[in-house]
Amino acid sequence: MYRSLSVLAEESDFIQSELYRNSNYIHPRNKRILYYDCTNYYFEIEEESGLKRYGKSKEHRPNPIVTMGLFMDADGIPMAFDIFPGNQNEQTTLKPLESKILQDFGCSEFIFCSDAGLGSTANRRFNSLVNRAYVITHSLKKMKKEDRDIALNPVQFRKLGYSSFIDLRTLDETDEEVFNTVYYKEIPVVTGSMDETIIVTYSPKYKAYQRKIRARQIERAQKIIASSDRKR
């Protein structure tokens, strides 16, 4: 097996594209939405070698690492991956791998999704070309104040499929349907030369979940404080 790894590495792009093509005969792949993310792997060695470079380890290890970028389809099934030097900025890993998907996988019309760390201006611009679009997570804390104020304003939300506006303060969150509904609002913004739309979502169910998590954290903190006081 180990002796075959060098051969597999050389033919990796071909193997991935053929696996994707043939997997469609077993289960038609949902390529309307593609998810992309990166991770890294560390090596217990003392010096850099090849792709193994000192970089920002997700496990905060002081060892050389390599970075892996992975695309998944809308069903969460892996499509394509590639390995990059551990000291390479993750944002720059997207374009070469996505270009392979465009060229070798026959995918040209999809919505690209990633977290904020991979949503550079260059990556967003690349995914606004031709028949592609993108959805990138965005931190409220990093928004402009005027946009953040609009996002946090409880008015002008909608339900999916409805055009009428909703004031979140009027919701009866004890109602099961209301509790399980996700509400949203759209905020048009201009980022440099790009026209974009910020989509703000509100979920009573997720709010209840986060409230429960915070309550448990507060309870644990209080127990730790009480225990510390007793030891004194």
Feature map (PLM): residue ranges:
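Anion-binding and metal-coordination hotspots
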Residues: 1-232
